[in-house]
């Protein structure tokens, strides 16, 4: 299957991320349509097992799960329906802007392949820094993780566009009581050379490995008090990334 439309039967069952693999090798696929409808009894007992399509995009039957966004769908901007709670966005050839609902009352679980080469921005509509689960700062998407005993106020970089062409990026300052969880969302960006990291942030030690760090990264500037260990500093230095405290 390399082009055209795919007629998905409602009886197929899968989790959303597996759809990415099902449709691999279909770069010309521009829309998905579903055919037969399940009974109300079926959808009540297995609501995530049945699918429907809307504007060429594949969802679970209640639209609460976005399963697959066609590679060749030509819209440059796409707004995730309000009722959609679980989203998986695979690599797309035309999509440049994704809009999600980030109002405080709206639960939302977001997953996007970092290899997406065209998506320039994810706009969290209604999002407020450190108050809602998602918010946008410039063209970078942030996420406040669910509170737990271990991570009461953890914040993450949820999406850093591969297309963002700034040579340096400074993580925004963070309020007292919050902290950035492991920073590791920059590895496929070929522009970034310098990363500025505040004290309340953990840089993932795995970024010392070539495949997990930006290919042109040459310096990480830490704020005084950052908890990066000496062994991690030494590992970065051995791989050509200088570490200093000039945040």
Spans of model-derived segments:
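Solvent-exposed loop and capping/linker segments of extracellular ligand-binding repeat ectodomains
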Residues: 1-247
């Amino acid at each position: 299957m390399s082009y055209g439309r795919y007629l998905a039967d409602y009886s197929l069952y899968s989790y959303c991320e597996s759809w990415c693999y099902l449709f691999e090798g279909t770069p010309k696929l521009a829309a998905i349509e579903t055919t037969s409808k399940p009974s109300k009894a079926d959808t009540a007992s297995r609501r995530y097992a049945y699918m429907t399509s809307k504007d060429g995009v594949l969802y679970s039957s209640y639209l609460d799960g976005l399963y697959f966004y066609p590679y060749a769908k030509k819209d440059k901007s796409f707004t995730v329906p309000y009722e959609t709670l679980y989203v998986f966005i695979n690599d797309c050839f035309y999509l440049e802007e994704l809009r999600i609902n980030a109002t405080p009352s709206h639960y939302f679980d977001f997953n996007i392949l970092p290899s997406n080469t065209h998506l320039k921005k994810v706009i969290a509509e209604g999002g407020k820094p450190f108050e809602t689960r998602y918010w946008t700062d410039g063209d970078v998407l942030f996420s406040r993780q669910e509170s737990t005993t271990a991570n009461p106020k953890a914040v993450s970089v949820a999406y850093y566009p591969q297309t963002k062409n700034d040579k340096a990026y400074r993580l925004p300052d963070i309020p007292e009581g919050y902290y950035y969880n492991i920073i590791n969302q920059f590895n496929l960006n070929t522009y970034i050379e310098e990363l500025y990291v505040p004290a309340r942030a953990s840089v993932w030690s795995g970024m010392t490995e070539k495949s997990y760090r930006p290919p042109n990264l040459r310096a990480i500037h830490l704020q005084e008090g950052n908890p990066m260990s000496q062994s991690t500093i030494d590992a970065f230095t051995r791989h050509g990334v200088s570490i200093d405290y000039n945040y």
